[in-house]
């Protein structure tokens, strides 16, 4: 019997998730089917209920439905509770359970795949939207020395600092007050895809700095290009994060963690 899984979003046509989970299934010998489901903007809850009522086993949720999924579930994993968003759903004893694997995906890609150190480091996070809130519950337990959240609207960054104040040394700042150097810089804005980077000072990076863009593309993103031009020792995009968060979802659903490296290599453009 083949178990059914899917990713729900709108738009969804460009999602790599079916390809990723197909490779995971082949690698681990799991019998699953995984599809894309484009859900009407007003039809998220009925689509989720219908999927599980028809025997579906698990869902990934992407934009714009992650916050709706957080509200919809009967129970949330602790990291999803703090994230304010859910990207992984499963049914347990008739109840809908929500988790968030985005932060774990980011941290595993940084530390396991790229060998970056976070403990004791000065970390800058650019942006204060849902993507950033989603990864802080996994980033902060890595014990960075300091985390600075920079955003055009400082009040949004301050709200995140208040929300996670018990998790470590955090501060909020506008781009006009940004002072380096930072050991790790994470871009959590989608503006990077459009080529519109926030105004970043030339002396932002410490020697040996790691720069990470949570978005990815077939070409180096504007932030990755900026990082390389400003002397980053390592500058990578978020393709590995995509694969690692999928691997974490697969582990939740199937009880086995697939190998991410061959999947990342298969997806990376030549």
Curated annotation (Swiss-Prot):
One example of a Gene Ontology biological process annotation: aromatic amino acid family biosynthetic process
Residues binding NADP(+): 127-131, 151-156, 214, 238
Keyword Kinase: no
Enzyme class: oxidoreductase
Molecular function terms from GO: NADP binding; shikimate 3-dehydrogenase (NADP+) activity
Protein name per its UniProtKB record: Shikimate dehydrogenase (NADP(+))
Pfam family membership, one: SDH_C
Record keywords, A-Z: Amino-acid biosynthesis, Aromatic amino acid biosynthesis, NADP, Oxidoreductase
UniProt-annotated binding residues for shikimate: 15-17, 62, 87, 102, 216
Reaction catalyzed: shikimate + NADP(+) = 3-dehydroshikimate + NADPH + H(+)
Active site: 66
Superkingdom of source: Bacteria
EC numbers, comma separated: 1.1.1.25
Cystine crosslinks: none
Role of this protein: Involved in the biosynthesis of the chorismate, which leads to the biosynthesis of aromatic amino acids. Catalyzes the reversible NADPH linked reduction of 3-dehydroshikimate (DHSA) to yield shikimate (SA).
Organism: Alkalilimnicola ehrlichii (strain ATCC BAA-1101 / DSM 17681 / MLHE-1)
Associated pathway: Metabolic intermediate biosynthesis; chorismate biosynthesis; chorismate from D-erythrose 4-phosphate and phosphoenolpyruvate: step 4/7
Subunit structure: Homodimer.
Family: Belongs to the shikimate dehydrogenase family.
GO cellular component assignments: cytosol
